[in-house]
């Protein structure tokens, strides 16, 4: 087993892992957004699950499109709650990121790592992860949008940029 692990992972295994990560991340960001839209929030609402599962499925098939869709849902949540400036800023930054990040799975996974890692207090590790898996222009754009995401999540209740802990602030 260890000898095979040293040989590395096949392209199929890397692609599968990237798509699973993108599906989980897209679903998580969409859930965060849908939970904060008053008209569709709640686990009993089928629209909540349509948004979450739709973004997760899109993330599994086309990771950058899943990231884009989930961030649109999150921006919509901010706009629906009356936070117009952060909602428009997040929407504009997401659109700008998409022009750089749509060229592969790595930038999408780097962006989605900000939400997943921040949920357990590891936001600084997501910047390292993003820099490791992407080229410099993609890493800069992804880190900028990830920083805006961390700032937005801090405004949801934790008031801490790097330690937004989902267990205490959901």
Q: What are the residue ranges of the model-derived segments?
A:
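Cytosolic juxtamembrane amphipathic/interface segments immediately preceding
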Residues: 2-17
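Juxtamembrane/interface motifs at transmembrane-helix termini
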Residues: 86-91, 107-108, 148, 161-164
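Cytoplasmic-side transmembrane-helix entry/capping segments in multi-pass membrane proteins
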Residues: 67-75, 88-89, 105-117, 141-145
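Generic multipass alpha-helical transmembrane bundles of integral membrane proteins
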Residues: 117-118, 122-170
């Amino acid at each position: 087993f260890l000898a095979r692990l040293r040989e590395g992972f096949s392209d199929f295994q890397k692609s599968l892992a990237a798509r699973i990560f993108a599906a989980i991340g897209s679903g998580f960001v969409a859930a965060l957004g849908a939970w904060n839209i008053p008209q569709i929030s709640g686990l009993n609402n089928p629209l909540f699950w349509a948004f979450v599962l739709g973004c997760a499925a899109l993330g599994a098939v086309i990771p950058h499109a899943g990231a884009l869709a989930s961030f649109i849902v999150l921006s919509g949540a901010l706009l629906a709650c009356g936070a117009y400036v952060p909602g428009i800023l997040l929407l504009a930054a997401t659109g700008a990121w998409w022009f750089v990040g749509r060229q592969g799975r790595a930038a999408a996974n780097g962006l989605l790592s900000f939400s997943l890692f921040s949920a357990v207090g590891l936001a600084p590790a997501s910047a390292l992860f993003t820099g490791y898996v992407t080229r410099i222009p993609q890493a800069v754009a992804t880190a900028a949008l990830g920083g805006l995401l961390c700032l937005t999540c801090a405004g949801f209740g934790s008031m801490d940029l790097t330690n937004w802990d989902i267990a205490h602030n959901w």
